[in-house]
Structures are given as structure tokens and as C-alpha cells.
Amino acid sequence: MEHDTLIQSQIEDSIRVKAQLLPSLLPNIKAAGKVLVDSLKGDGILYFAGNGGSSCDASHIAAELVIRYKSGNERKAIPAIALNSDQAVLTACANDYGYEFLFQRQLQAFGKSKDVFIGLTTSGNSKNIILAVEEAKKNGMKVVLLLGGDGGKLKGKADVEIIIPSSVTARIQESHILIGHILCSIIEKELFGLD
């Protein structure tokens, strides 16, 4: 089984997309870090959400914050919740109201003006993320969006948006998790002085 070309092209494509992040998205990544840190300094909670692979990324980033990002960095837990993690709430909402309301209903219940909603969507067109953004804004929350391609319907709807310059879902998700890790580093450094 020979897959040298496939493997090489996947790695090169991933490198190419990530190389574009630094010059074009550095200010937005820094701005997102500031929004998250400011919320946490004000006793806010970070609410993450996504669908499919982005759901896994949302849960991953929230877990890094609640537990710890870097091994050996002992620190207080950071309040971060992945809204896509409670199966009872998700299935009840999908059954009773519809899948598009999964995150909106939870933000309606819990979101406060000191909190931040962080939505991950590779297309920028996920209806449940769109409704969550609208609910977050109603609650006076800040919104950070990790998007892909042209940003979709969510382009221009956030306080800070980070749009990955690719239309390939895998490349967008790889970049989203990289940015999530960078944001974890910024938070640990700003709140606890950890490198």
C-alpha cells in the first residue's frame, strides 16, 4: 500500500493553511484572547459550541480550560462549558423544539452579560450556532466565532471572528484546534502567569 503522495499532499496543505494564519489572523487571535481573559477576570463563564467535528473541538477546548492545558501547569479550574455535551438537554431540545435551538435554549437559561459564547463552525452557516449568537447578543454576551471559508452567514456577526482561509473542512478544523490551544495558552499566561 503506497500512499506517499497522499500523505505528503495532506501535510503540505495543512502547513500552507496554517502559514496563512500568522500574518492575516494574528490581530484577531489576540483580540479573541483579550475578550476571553477579560470575561474570566470578571467572573464570567466561557460557553463553547459546535456540530460534528467542531463539537469535539468545542469539548476539547473547554476540557483544557477546566482541567489544564499544559502538563505541570497546576492552577485553579477555569469556568468553561461545552454546550454540546449534555445528552439529556440536547435530545430533549431536538425532540421538543428542534435541533436548531440546542445552544440557544441553553444560553437563554444560563448566559449572562459577563460571559462569552465561542462558536465553532467550518461553514459559518450552522443554524444552531446562528441562533446561539443571536441569543448571546440578547443577553449582552460577547461572541467569538471560529469560522472557515468565506465565513458564511455568520461573517460580521461576532465581536471577534477568526476565519480560516480554506474551504477544506479538515484544514479548517485543524486550524480551529490550533487556535483553541493558543487561546488556552493566552488564558493560562494572563490569569496565572504560566508559560
Swiss-Prot record:
Example of a GO MF term? zinc ion binding
* Record carries keyword Cytoplasm: yes
Under catalytic activity, the entry for this protein gives:
2 D-sedoheptulose 7-phosphate = D-glycero-alpha-D-manno-heptose 7-phosphate + D-glycero-beta-D-manno-heptose 7-phosphate
User: Which Pfam families does the record cross-reference, listed alphabetically?
Assistant: SIS_2
Q: Which Gene3D superfamilies match?
A: Glucose-6-phosphate isomerase like protein, domain 1
Which residues does Zn(2+) bind? H60, E64, Q173, H181
Q: Which residues form a coiled coil?
A: none
Major site of localization recorded for this protein? cytoplasm
Q: What cofactor is needed? A: Zn(2+)
- Additional remarks: The reaction produces a racemic mixture of D-glycero-alpha-D-manno-heptose 7-phosphate and D-glycero-beta-D-manno-heptose 7-phosphate.
Name used for this protein in its record:
Phosphoheptose isomerase
